[in-house]
């Protein structure tokens, strides 16, 4: 009798995606993050669903409903801590996943790469929308500052900002719609992730060498299911350690105070995973210029495939490109640090230099390094 997983219409899809999928024999732990992101998404949807059962999206009761979840709901404190810190784990995996793609040249699967940038944007939108529902001071002022950026758009900006707010400022209508967006967008992300996988399985996975290894493929199960399970163990270890021992370490203390439109916090900043983009936004003295730089910081990912000049796909054997990549990684950490600092010297100039150093390797230095490495590999005799 033929195995059911190979004949059943639904089982067949799962089989071709996770069991009999031909995978390169040499993919490293850097290829774990796709499955970890899937797990993170499931954790966020499940914990979010239970939080939504007890949350009320009204300006008068939102803050106290979150306190009620933590105090009175069975394991509500744990569900909330897992949800809040799960977002941090989600972004950590996302950044490492994108970094892996850049380092090993995975972006040359253009459709897979581009359909991956779209969920990245959607995750960022979801996380921003999710920062508003607790209705603390930083929730309110973060929403005010970021949505205010829309007013920088010429001609339609102010109208657009007021349309998003549902009034003349961030208020009850804004909170309700942001909660609605935050609830629905994870399901959109799940659909986009399936499309991302669909395109990936058209070509098969890349591997550290960047070479096509058609003759040397192994089945995904049991080799990579076990490997992914190990990655999941580490993910859960870090997430549970954060949620149980230090749940508020990545949050902002201002968010323990209820939202007050009459009292501005001394330093408005988003969650840590947006700080790099926030630093780029603040480094431009012009409002519209800052918004464009903010968008460009993510949109540059879309043009990376067209800036690839090297004859080799992966950076594994390209030391000059490797150096530039790690400069970029260190620079992202610098931007994250700057985004959390007040707007004063020397942080302003450091932020401006770091912003220039963010775009330079991607747009100029890496393509030039690729050409230089091609030249160095050419036989000179």
UniProtKB/Swiss-Prot annotation:
Can you tell me where the transmembrane regions are? 33-53, 77-98, 113-133, 178-198, 226-246, 288-308, 320-340, 347-367
State the Gene Ontology terms under molecular function. Answer: metal ion binding; ubiquinol-cytochrome-c reductase activity
Cofactor requirements of the protein: heme b
Q: Summarize where heme b b562 binds, as residue positions.
A: 83, 182
* Binding, heme b b566: 97, 196
Superkingdom, taxonomy of origin = Eukaryota
Q: How does it assemble?
A: The cytochrome bc1 complex contains 11 subunits: 3 respiratory subunits (MT-CYB, CYC1 and UQCRFS1), 2 core proteins (UQCRC1 and UQCRC2) and 6 low-molecular weight proteins (UQCRH/QCR6, UQCRB/QCR7, UQCRQ/QCR8, UQCR10/QCR9, UQCR11/QCR10 and a cleavage product of UQCRFS1). This cytochrome bc1 complex then forms a dimer.
The remark listed among the other comments is: Heme 1 (or BL or b562) is low-potential and absorbs at about 562 nm, and heme 2 (or BH or b566) is high-potential and absorbs at about 566 nm.
Task of the protein:
Component of the ubiquinol-cytochrome c reductase complex (complex III or cytochrome b-c1 complex) that is part of the mitochondrial respiratory chain. The b-c1 complex mediates electron transfer from ubiquinol to cytochrome c. Contributes to the generation of a proton gradient across the mitochondrial membrane that is then used for ATP synthesis.
Q: What is this protein called?
A: Cytochrome b
